[in-house]
Amino acid sequence: AFWRSVFDDYESDEFMFEISVPLRNDLAKGKKVVLHLAEDPEVRDTLFCIDSDFDYLFADQTPVSREINRTPHIFHTYAYATENYLCYAPSLHNICVKATKNDTNIFDFEKFFADYSRTIYPLFLWYAYSAQQESEHIFTLADFRASVRLNFLEIEHNGLRTLAWLRRNVARRDQALRERHAEMIEPKRAFAEKLFRRGVTPENTYLF
């Protein structure tokens, strides 16, 4: 459905797109498979659509991101995955209105996600940088998820208490990582500047 919504605007009398996904569970999946298929001259009329993960952000700094970004008929998201777009903050109020038939605005999604993003940004940098360096053991995806998960959400005051609780958890983990891996602090700062040039800011981290 996501990629259909992308390509619908480009259909014409000359161009038509048919979106298909593997139907059998035994079909091979993954980026290596896509890259192998993309080299086949018999599928030159096929566009391969994938989640970026970090390949867009890494900007040719890893072998896979180089290959993905230089293959002309591979489309990938700027965000980590298509699901990130479903959480696009400016759209969430309208989704609630459609679901509840009630337009009362009791929660500012845009402010909350900006505040949430600023809160988790330090740990996002640790995880993304360690992933680019192929040192995921320093701060694994499981550790990152556990560190930024919201165990409760206070609707009143737009999640103020929730974010305060999360901020304390993030600060503790960030401090522990700084003490354990002090040699990564300066390179990580330069890495953050590269991410900024790719569109990542402390306020929109939730998309990536």
Model-derived features: positions:
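Acidic, divalent-metal-binding catalytic cores of TOPRIM
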Residues: 1-208
